């Protein structure tokens, strides 16, 4: 059993995966709030409570974090509470198996890397990955499995909350599809702006990427998998015209792939690269 921990700015996903390679599957997944000042002891208490008896069956652990302070605590937690369980933390220097063809590879978020890795392994072809998190990341992986870069936009919930916070006439609304793109009240107007506006944003970015990436021109452009993931993806999927696939567990499988690559490359206890 593999413990996978995906820490983002607002929420953390904890997953348990069984099997390996093409036989791997996510058997449990939980979503909890991310606390930037959480301690290793608190993390251990939460995660041990979630996984229960499966704690004794862990054969490995893999984690990423877009919050550096939390990644430090995850490392301490794994060392102290599961010292016999080999683990990999996704950070600069660790073997991911995906070349980063960008100006500064160290700046690329671990979540973006493992998503593209998972998409390439799942579809075996060039792909565009759309991750709907606190930010919307639209990233490109080539037919050779290379990370080519991407675009980052404000997330759906973050944008909606910011609009409400900075306007006296607007309030925080439930993220839901309105009756029509033409809202009949303030709530519906905000929902229409969020749902249809962000769907147009994503479709626009994907379309421009298909045009701008030389590899995607001509017949090859028809062999580009476009996959969505992330907590708010299901809200927008019905309105998206460019997305072909949805994978709720894409990031967890990316973590698994990095763990397996490092397990095969090293003997004994796995360590993160320094």
UniProtKB/Swiss-Prot annotation:
Its main location: cytoplasm. The keyword Translocase does not apply. Keywords: ATP-binding, Coenzyme A biosynthesis, Cytoplasm, Kinase, Metal-binding, Nucleotide-binding, Potassium, Transferase. ATP binds at residues 6-13, 134. The keyword DNA repair does not apply. GO terms for cellular component: cytoplasm. Gene3D superfamilies: 3.30.420.40. The active site is at 111 (proton acceptor). A monovalent cation. Ammonium or potassium. Its cofactor is NH4(+); K(+). Its EC number is 2.7.1.33. SUPFAM superfamilies: Actin-like ATPase domain. K(+) binds at residue 131. It catalyses: (R)-pantothenate + ATP = (R)-4'-phosphopantothenate + ADP + H(+). Pathway: Cofactor biosynthesis; coenzyme A biosynthesis; CoA from (R)-pantothenate: step 1/5. Homodimer. This is Type III pantothenate kinase. It comes from Mycobacterium leprae (strain TN). The lineage of its organism: Bacteria, Bacillati, Actinomycetota, Actinomycetes, Mycobacteriales. The gene is coaX.
């Amino acid at each position: 059993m593999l413990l996978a921990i995906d820490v983002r700015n607002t929420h953390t996903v904890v997953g348990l995966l069984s099997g390996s390679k093409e036989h791997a599957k996510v058997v449990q997944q939980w979503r909890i709030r991310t606390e930037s000042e959480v301690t290793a002891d608190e993390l251990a208490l939460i995660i041990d409570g979630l996984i229960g008896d499966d704690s004794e069956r862990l054969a490995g652990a893999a984690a990423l974090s877009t919050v550096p302070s939390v990644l430090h605590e995850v490392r301490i937690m794994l060392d102290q509470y599961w010292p016999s369980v080999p683990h990999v933390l996704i950070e600069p220097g660790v073997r991911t198996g995906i070349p980063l063809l960008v100006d500064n590879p160290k700046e690329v978020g671990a979540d973006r890397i493992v998503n593209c890795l998972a998409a390439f392994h799942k579809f075996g072809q060039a792909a565009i990955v759309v991750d709907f998190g606190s930010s919307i990341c639209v990233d490109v992986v080539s037919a050779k499995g290379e990370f080519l870069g991407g675009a980052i936009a404000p997330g759906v919930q973050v944008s909606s909350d910011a609009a409400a916070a900075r306007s006296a006439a607007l309030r925080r609304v439930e993220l839901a599809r309105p009756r029509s793109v033409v809202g009949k009240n303030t709530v519906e107007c905000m929902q229409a702006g969020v749902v249809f506006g962000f769907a147009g944003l994503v479709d626009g970015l994907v379309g421009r990427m298909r045009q701008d990436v030389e590899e995607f021109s001509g017949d090859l452009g028809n062999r580009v998998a476009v996959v969505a993931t992330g907590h708010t993806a299901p809200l927008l999927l019905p309105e998206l015209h460019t997305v072909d696939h949805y994978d709720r567990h894409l990031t967890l499988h990316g973590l698994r792939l990095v763990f397996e690559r490092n397990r095969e490359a090293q003997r004994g206890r796995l360590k993160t690269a320094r």
